[in-house]
Swiss-Prot record:
It comes from Alcelaphine herpesvirus 1 (strain C500) (AlHV-1). Residues 72-89 have a biased composition (Acidic residues). This is Uncharacterized gene 45 protein. Residues 112-124 have a biased composition (Low complexity). It comes from the Viruses.
C-alpha cells in the first residue's frame, strides 16, 4: 500500500533528477503588541526582585550598638546600668572592648619572641608606645669547637727567608763592586793591564771555535756517487 501513496517531493519539475527547492528559514520581526506585552511582564518581574514585599509575620528590629564606644561616654555607662536592672534572671551581656592594633601586635611579638627580647620590649613599652614594625634582633649562632676542624696552623719559619735576603744582599754587593771595578778599568787602562775580564776571554774562545768550524765546512753538496775529485774536509 505504501507504494501507492504520493511522495512529498520538493522538486522544481515533475521529472526525475530535477533540482530540489532550497529550504531556508526566514526571520520575522515580532509585532508591536507582543513587544508591549513582554515589556509589561519584564517590568513586573523587576519590581518584585528589587523591591520585595514584606513577609507576613512579626517585624524584628535589629539594634546593633558599637562595641568600641569612646572612653568616658555616658551611653556606655547607661547600657551597663540598664542591663543590670532589667535582666534579673539572665546575666547581663557586656560589650567587649576591642583591642587596639598596637596592643595586638605587641602581644603577638611577646608570644613569638624569646625571653630576652620580651623583657627588652616590655621595658621599652612602659610608656604605652609599641614599635611593632621593628623585628626582634637576631643573635649570631655560637661556634662550637675549633672552627678550623681541630687542625693547628703550622708555625712559619722565617729563618730561611732571612738567609736568602742576606745572600741576595751579598750578591748585589759583589755585582755592584765588580761592575764598578770594570768601569774603572775601562777609564784607567794603566790599572787593568794585568787583569783580564773572564767574560771577554770566553767570548774570544767561542769566536775562534766558530772560525775553525767554518774552515772545515763543505763548500758545496757532495755528489751522489763517486766524486773522487771532491774536496772532502778531512783530506
Amino acid at each position: 500500500m505504501a507504494m501507492f501513496f504520493k511522495k512529498n517531493d520538493d522538486r522544481m519539475f515533475p521529472i526525475e533528477g530535477a533540482p530540489r527547492r532550497k529550504r531556508t528559514n526566514f526571520f520575522t520581526f515580532p509585532s508591536l503588541q507582543k513587544l508591549h506585552q513582554n515589556a509589561k511582564l519584564n517590568d513586573g518581574d523587576n519590581d518584585e526582585v528589587f523591591s520585595p514585599e514584606p513577609s507576613s509575620g512579626e517585624s524584628i528590629d535589629l539594634d546593633i550598638s558599637p562595641l568600641t564606644p569612646p572612653d568616658g561616654s555616658d551611653d556606655y555607662s547607661d547600657v551597663e546600668d540598664g542591663g543590670a536592672e532589667e535582666g534579673d534572671s539572665d546575666p547581663p551581656i557586656k560589650p567587649v572592648r576591642a583591642a587596639r592594633l598596637g596592643e595586638r601586635c605587641c602581644a603577638g611579638l611577646k608570644r613569638t619572641s624569646s625571653t630576652s627580647t620580651a623583657s627588652t620590649s616590655s621595658g621599652s613599652n612602659d610608656g604605652g608606645d609599641c614599635n611593632y614594625y621593628a623585628p626582634p634582633a637576631k643573635k649570631p649562632a655560637p661556634i662550637h669547637g675549633n672552627p678550623l676542624g681541630g687542625k693547628r696552623r703550622p708555625e712559619l719559619d722565617l729563618s730561611p727567608k732571612i738567609e736568602n735576603r742576606s745572600d741576595s744582599s751579598s750578591r748585589e754587593s759583589t755585582t755592584s763592586s765588580d761592575s764598578w771595578d770594570y768601569v774603572n778599568n775601562k777609564d784607567n787602562p794603566s790599572r787593568g793591564q794585568g787583569n783580564e775580564n773572564p767574560s771577554a776571554s770566553d767570548s774570544l774562545g767561542a769566536l775562534q771555535a766558530a772560525c775553525i768550524h767554518q774552515d772545515h765546512a763543505m763548500p758545496t753538496t757532495p755528489p751522489v756517487k763517486g766524486g773522487e775529485d771532491y774536496p772532502w774536509p778531512w783530506n
